[in-house]
């Protein structure tokens, strides 16, 4: 059943909406999304919408995950920082595509569960609890940065951690007015911007989440 649901998701939600990256489609066809959602939502894992994962967070709908990753324009072996790892699904897709993943999650319980899922799948992802606004400076620079929460603006620390030619994909704006942006670094202080349209994400908060 899940293989069939995954195949339908690829055809009706991704390919039908213009997702063309072959490596991305292959990875999303291989990663078991149902392993990344709470058991009570497993039957809805391939539904065309977000699902709650705890701590007030969600796993984005499959199309939005695909849109953001395709916007990164990844090449095999690139170093990628994910801010807002959540349940670990996007990190799993990125790692399956051959990227070297560094992931940050502000909620310790989500990070611990994601780490366990990724390890069980044999995926090498470095994941730590931290404030996504700060990025991961000691591991920088990154070829790509994916931010899975909406900022009021693009955090300057993340821009500084982007390699020359690197791409940063982030939703920006207030609730009800967010847009998905890609910044490509063209020089020390020069960034080229592209708008990928309206989206809706949980906010990118500062600090780490409270325990419990």
UniProtKB/Swiss-Prot annotation:
Q: Name one GO cellular component term.
A: cytoplasm
- Active site, per annotation: 60
Supply the SUPFAM superfamilies for this chain: S-adenosyl-L-methionine-dependent methyltransferases
What are this entry's molecular-function GO terms? protein-L-isoaspartate (D-aspartate) O-methyltransferase activity
Give the InterPro entries listed for this entry.
Answer: PCMT, SAM-dependent_MTases_sf
E.C. number: 2.1.1.77
Keyword list (alphabetical) reads: Cytoplasm, Methyltransferase, S-adenosyl-L-methionine, Transferase
Entry annotated with the keyword S-adenosyl-L-methionine: yes
| Subcellular locations according to the entry | Cytoplasm
Primary localization class, coarse: cytoplasm
Q: Does the keyword Transferase apply?
A: yes
Gene Ontology annotations of biological process type: methylation; protein modification process; protein repair
Query: What is the documented function of this protein?
Result: Catalyzes the methyl esterification of L-isoaspartyl residues in peptides and proteins that result from spontaneous decomposition of normal L-aspartyl and L-asparaginyl residues. It plays a role in the repair and/or degradation of damaged proteins.
For this entry, the protein name equals Protein-L-isoaspartate O-methyltransferase
What is the originating organism of this protein? Answer: Methylorubrum populi (strain ATCC BAA-705 / NCIMB 13946 / BJ001) (Methylobacterium populi)
- Gene name as annotated: pcm
């Amino acid at each position: 059943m899940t293989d069939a649901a995954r195949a339908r998701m690829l055809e009706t939600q991704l390919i039908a909406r213009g997702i063309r990256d072959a490596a991305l489609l292959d990875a999303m066809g291989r990663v078991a999304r149902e392993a990344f959602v709470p058991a009570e939502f497993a039957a809805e894992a391939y539904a065309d919408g977000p699902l709650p994962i705890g701590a007030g967070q969600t796993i984005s709908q499959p199309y939005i995950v695909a849109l953001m990753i395709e916007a990164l324009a990844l090449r095999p072996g690139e170093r990628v920082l994910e801010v807002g790892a959540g349940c670990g699904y996007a990190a799993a897709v990125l790692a399956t595509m051959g990227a070297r993943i560094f992931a940050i999650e502000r909620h310790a319980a989500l990070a611990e569960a994601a780490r366990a899922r990724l390890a069980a799948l044999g995926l090498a992802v470095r994941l730590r609890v931290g404030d996504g606004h700060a990025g991961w400076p000691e591991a920088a620079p990154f070829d790509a940065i994916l931010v899975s929460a909406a900022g009021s603006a693009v955090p300057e620390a993340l821009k500084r951690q982007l390699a020359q030619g690197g791409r940063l994909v982030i939703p920006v704006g207030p609730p009800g007015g967010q847009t998905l942006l890609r910044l490509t670094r063209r020089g020390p202080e020069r960034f080229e911007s592209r708008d990928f349209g309206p989206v809706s994400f949980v906010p990118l908060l500062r600090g780490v989440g409270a325990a419990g």
